[in-house]
Amino acid sequence: MSTEVPEILLAHYLKILKLPTFQREYQKLARLCATEGVDHVGYLFRLAEREMIERDRRKVERRIKAAKFPVVKSLDSFDFSAIPKLNKMQVLELARCEWIERRENVIALGPSGTGKTHVALGLGLAACQKGLSVGFTTAAALVSEMMEARDERRLLRFQKQMAAYKLLIIDELGFVPLSKTGAELLFELISQRYERGATLITSNLPFDEWTETLGSERLTGALLDRITHHVNILEINGDSYRLAQSRARKAG
């Protein structure tokens, strides 16, 4: 049998078995292991290890894509020194994602431009890296999608999709006042996720001003009652983080 036939068949089998890293690395790694005197078990271990590492990397990539982040940002790139009032240790503790497993919530409060979205994106990325499903949206976009889904009689399916995320990030609550129907739909979604999934909300408004966005004191009170039952508050106050970053880039 030609030496090419086993190689062709092996490539075919590895493709069927969905082992692309095996296919890409087995010859190069075999030569390396031969040089180092590694036995067949060690060779297979290294090959399987590379396949697992690559498979985990692809899974993380798929979760990041499914999350629909507007941009991928990590906490490693966040300049905590620019927002000294932000509790860095609290943020790093949240990055361990144990609060998500406990189905708790996080609310990040602070003026516009102080880095709330960056922190939310960083925590979302950390969750993706730990194997958790994440969804990212703005409050205005979420409400718009729910109203459209309601009009097209697919609201229940959309709500189930939102409820299925281990972590749902709702950015920019408070930037745009919601209609009565929109506020009610948001409340309904928060209620569905209550103690079933973790939710992270960022807002430029303190709690006592949420009525300006939600319209009804009764609805605001009921929503806060659910969202703050098991909650971690991040107070992100200070000068504009975006402005500080812009100045730093120009200075550099």
For each feature predicted by the language model, list its residue ranges:
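Interdomain "pre-motor" coupling segment immediately N-terminal to P-loop NTPase/helicase cores
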Residues: A11, K15, P20-V71
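Walker B motif beta-strand of ABC-family P-loop ATPases
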Residues: L167
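AAA+ P-loop ATPase motor domain of ring mechanoenzymes
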Residues: F45-E98, S240, A244-A251
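Solvent-exposed alpha-helical segments within well-ordered globular domains of core cellular machineries
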Residues: I8-K15, R24-Q27, G42-R46, R62, ...
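Intrinsically disordered, low-complexity and often Lys/Arg-enriched segments
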Residues: M1-H12, R247-G252
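Conserved P-loop
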Residues: L86-A164, T211-T213
